[in-house]
UniProtKB/Swiss-Prot annotation:
Residue span(s) of domain Protein kinase: 15-281
Gene Ontology cellular-component terms listed: cytoplasm; nucleus; site of double-strand break
Family according to the record: Belongs to the protein kinase superfamily. CAMK Ser/Thr protein kinase family. NIM1 subfamily.
PANTHER family linked: CALCIUM/CALMODULIN-DEPENDENT PROTEIN KINASE KINASE-RELATED, SERINE_THREONINE-PROTEIN KINASE CHK1
Subcellular location, record wording: Nucleus
Gene Ontology terms describing biological process: DNA damage checkpoint signaling; mitotic G2 DNA damage checkpoint signaling; replication fork processing
Chain positions recorded as ATP binding sites: 21-29, 45
Protein name in UniProt: Serine/threonine-protein kinase CHK1
Catalytic machinery residues: 142 (proton acceptor)
Role according to the record: Serine/threonine-protein kinase which is required for checkpoint-mediated cell cycle arrest and activation of DNA repair in response to the presence of DNA damage or unreplicated DNA. May also negatively regulate cell cycle progression during unperturbed cell cycles. Controls phosphorylation and abundance of PDS1 to prevent anaphase entry. Also helps prevent mitotic exit.
More about this protein: Present with 2530 molecules/cell in log phase SD medium.
Annotated GO MF terms: ATP binding; protein serine kinase activity; protein serine/threonine kinase activity
Record-linked Pfam families: Pkinase (PF00069)
Amino acid sequence: MSLSQVSPLPHIKDVVLGDTVGQGAFACVKNAHLQMDPSIILAVKFIHVPTCKKMGLSDKDITKEVVLQSKCSKHPNVLRLIDCNVSKEYMWIILEMADGGDLFDKIEPDVGVDSDVAQFYFQQLVSAINYLHVECGVAHRDIKPENILLDKNGNLKLADFGLASQFRRKDGTLRVSMDQRGSPPYMAPEVLYSEEGYYADRTDIWSIGILLFVLLTGQTPWELPSLENEDFVFFIENDGNLNWGPWSKIEFTHLNLLRKILQPDPNKRVTLKALKLHPWVLRRASFSGDDGLCNDPELLAKKLFSHLKVSLSNENYLKFTQDTNSNNRYISTQPIGNELAELEHDSMHFQTVSNTQRAFTSYDSNTNYNSGTGMTQEAKWTQFISYDIAALQFHSDENDCNELVKRHLQFNPNKLTKFYTLQPMDVLLPILEKALNLSQIRVKPDLFANFERLCELLGYDNVFPLIINIKTKSNGGYQLCGSISIIKIEEELKSVGFERKTGDPLEWRRLFKKISTICRDIILIPN
């Protein structure tokens, strides 16, 4: 259930709310624009205060995020806080819109990005954290993929100061932290093991190293830096000198840098000052200007999107439909009746439908067709989706796909975990239901019968958009929550989108790729 269904969102003067672009346990983020000037796009974060208090947070805890992010908003790689206020049940924060979307929505699991892209984002993250530590005295304490966004030119924007803390006092002395906070794979070992406390700024440096590893390999080195985790223990025993698994993909120069950062003893860990002098940080990326910002968004997008691919091959299809070990990558405990994933009418996302339909209408009216060619409706739809990077990731002809990508490259907030289909619902839903079951996601049986009941109640024209809320666990045992939305764009053309709410973006993309492969026969692919 969305927060707006629990309590109506407050009205914000002169601001028009749009789609929900993110949602967590006690907060949601919507895009918005100014009423007087729709060209000025914003993001509004709504924090549900009663839910926060149920989770044990005080008023000071709730407002601390605003205080610290406001203090840290004068750096180009930190998401800027514009305004905030409190209503009866919500605290709302107006932020600049990261209109390039999520960085890790664009990274292929188990592949990562090429060295130039990793270097560029590593440099920008180091710059942002250096600003936080040196000029603001603030440690972020939750550096992870979910909190790395992009602007319209592809520049990194560090977001979410919910766990941040002021580690340096006004007199220059450093506070010692005692609490365990952060996301397990990105957490520094001293957060778990230090009995005398730790310095929060040093834990940020560790998290930067883990994020760099993920950029280079498309996976985390371990689930938790714990002595119970064999991957982490192996790393410690070999003093970071590893050449197997994902470590074997990393060039020697980058391995050397990672070993300096991922030093379990925080007193031996490289400092930010030393990190800024590393050759990989000093050498400018090919699409980076003197100010460290992207000066060639098209080249950056080309490099970033080039590794995105969903293979619908027979080999992958057989692996996902017949291999028991593959099917068990995602774990789902036996749910009680009301936890079964089921098909519902999504009354909260009318705006999303309107935007998608407007995109097609705009494309349709701006496209000149040669009446002599007699272009079919299906050909028109296929041409329309060729403007969406999400559709191109299924293309089997790499050269043809690269040409399409070059024509339509741009950063935008649209999710890439999506496919299009022309299949009727009596074909689409049984195949989707099969894919969910094979992914160990428990579904209320017969999605199509449920769809027919909704049609009787609402009528076919009013039944869309549809939503299936899903909950599962990754191989590491961490929760993945999100939804699958089915949106009717025009007549038979529909989009099937996978929206992550909580959990690792790379694990969510793995799940999307698996379900898409099982649904391969219904996916519309540009050709």
